[in-house]
Amino acid sequence: MRRLVLSAVVLLVAESLGAQAPIKTIEDGALDKIQLFVASIDQPADVMVVIKPFDASGADLGTGGKDGKEARQQEAATMKNEGPRVLAERFVATLEKGPFKGVRALKAEEAVPDGALVVEGKFVTIDPGSRAKRYFAGFGAGKSSVKVTGSVKDATGRTLATFEQRRIGTMGMGGGDSLGKLMSDAKSIGEDIGKFLARWARRESLD
């Protein structure tokens, strides 16, 4: 009897894990990595999309960490505060013309509207890089980077897709403005995610 119970538990766990397996994985396409758990979004014209503020609290700050220069730490701290906002704003702007019924950014504690698709995620990396290396070593050295991971869920909390996206900035021989590039990259990532969602909803290629 005990063996039968254990077998049943193992079977249930296996079925549960199988149900979570993506039906398709796409790398270096619309985003760096996309895992789809459903083939498409049904009737997007009737669907509201919301984006929650991406969590930046656990991001790897690179040269903006506690051992970095004060200027880099300040840039990283500013990005932790402002990055989620500018990402969400660009995401919303990208989808305002469709194909969804509507799109808006939620505040941190705001409730999700009934029936809405939810985009949420976190900043994995917010690295200002090294301005000195960019200045003296030139192209490719001391590059800054911003990376996020996230998911798209339906109103019941079921995961429809997961994604990863990273933007890297070198800024050339002059060294460049690390904070300006980080903010620009956060906006670009918001746009990238919005375009991915639009292409997926329109059943266009994500490769």
Go through each PLM region and give its residues.
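Surface-exposed short loop/turn segments
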Residues: A21-I23, G98, L106-R158, T170-D177
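Short secondary-structure boundary motifs at beta->alpha junctions and helix caps
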Residues: E70-T78, A141, K153-R203
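N-terminal signal peptide c-region/cleavage motif recognized by signal peptidases
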Residues: A14-S16
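A structural "domain/chain start" motif
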Residues: G18-E89, R166, K195-D207
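A structural motif corresponding to the C-terminal end of an alpha-helix
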Residues: L87-R104, A155
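Sec-exported extracytoplasmic/periplasmic mature domains
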Residues: V92-F100, P128, G194, A198-R202
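Positively charged n-region of N-terminal signal peptides that target proteins for export
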Residues: M1-L4
